[in-house]
């Protein structure tokens, strides 16, 4: 049976009693985002909206994004990526569990020097997919060209964020490319493997 969104007690400053609010809302108050599911349009809209709100509240204070995701929609992930670069706060990214596909892309997109992985995290890169291509021959050709364009652009961004040569990125993502936390650090996807949250907050 689904348990729904967990709720936690929270007392507003100056109030004598606590009130129960959703765990997500409590994390947002601490400027913490958690991507803990496949990335789709609904999740992206929520994450984008919260980032815009936190930017308006304090454009100088870091936003921390925890990632435990198998990946998901390219367009949804790119909406999050563009917003990360659109707003002023630094984005601290932390992999817990796994960051695969678009999850790994967003992990690497955090602010340089503030990208972390917990010790037993797994990171996986591969080439993007825009879904099954069907329809008339002309439609298939258009979709195939778009897939190649998106693939090229994502590889270029990964080359920028990791410091790896574009040619190496293109070779590595042709098949599922798995890395441990320490391997992801050596590759340039994260800057450091950490044990405690305070290590990320002190970056």
From Swiss-Prot:
PROSITE patterns: CLP_PROTEASE_HIS (PS00382), CLP_PROTEASE_SER (PS00381). GO terms for biological process: protein quality control for misfolded or incompletely synthesized proteins. It is an enzyme of class 3 (hydrolase). The active site is at residues 101, 126. The keyword Ion transport does not apply. It is found in: Cytoplasm. Its main location: cytoplasm. SUPFAM superfamilies: ClpP/crotonase. Gene3D superfamilies: 2-enoyl-CoA Hydratase, Chain A, domain 1. InterPro entries: ClpP, ClpP/crotonase-like_dom_sf, ClpP/TepA, ClpP_His_AS, ClpP_Ser_AS. Its EC number is 3.4.21.92. Coiled coil: none annotated. It holds the Pfam family CLP_protease. GO terms for cellular component: cytoplasm; endopeptidase Clp complex. Keywords: Cytoplasm, Hydrolase, Protease, Serine protease. It catalyses: Hydrolysis of proteins to small peptides in the presence of ATP and magnesium. alpha-casein is the usual test substrate. In the absence of ATP, only oligopeptides shorter than five residues are hydrolyzed (such as succinyl-Leu-Tyr-|-NHMec, and Leu-Tyr-Leu-|-Tyr-Trp, in which cleavage of the -Tyr-|-Leu- and -Tyr-|-Trp bonds also occurs). One of its GO terms (molecular function) is ATPase binding. Cleaves peptides in various proteins in a process that requires ATP hydrolysis. Has a chymotrypsin-like activity. Plays a major role in the degradation of misfolded proteins. Belongs to the peptidase S14 family. Fourteen ClpP subunits assemble into 2 heptameric rings which stack back to back to give a disk-like structure with a central cavity, resembling the structure of eukaryotic proteasomes. NCBIfam families: PRK00277.1, PRK12553.1. PANTHER family: ATP-DEPENDENT CLP PROTEASE PROTEOLYTIC SUBUNIT (PTHR10381:SF70). This is ATP-dependent Clp protease proteolytic subunit 1.
């Amino acid at each position: 049976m689904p348990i729904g969104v967990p709720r936690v007690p929270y007392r507003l400053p100056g109030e004598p009693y606590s009130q129960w609010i959703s765990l997500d809302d409590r994390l947002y108050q601490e400027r913490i985002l958690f991507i803990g599911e496949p990335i789709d349009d609904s999740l992206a809209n929520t994450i984008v909206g919260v980032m815009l709100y936190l930017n308006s509240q304090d454009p100088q204070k870091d936003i921390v994004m925890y990632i435990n995701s198998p990946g998901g929609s390219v367009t949804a992930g790119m909406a999050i990526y563009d917003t990360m670069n659109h707003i002023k706060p630094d984005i601290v990214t932390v992999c817990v569990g796994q960051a695969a596909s678009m999850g790994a892309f967003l992990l690497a997109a955090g602010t340089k020097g503030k990208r972390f992985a917990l010790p037993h995290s797994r990171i996986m890169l591969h080439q993007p997919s825009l879904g099954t291509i069907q329809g008339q021959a002309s439609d298939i050709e258009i979709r195939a060209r778009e897939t190649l364009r998106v693939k090229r652009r994502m590889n270029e961004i990964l080359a920028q964020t990791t410091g790896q040569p574009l040619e190496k990125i293109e070779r590595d993502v042709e098949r599922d490319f798995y890395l441990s936390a320490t391997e992801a650090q050596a590759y340039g996807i994260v800057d450091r493997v950490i044990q405690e949250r305070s290590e990320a907050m002190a970056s």
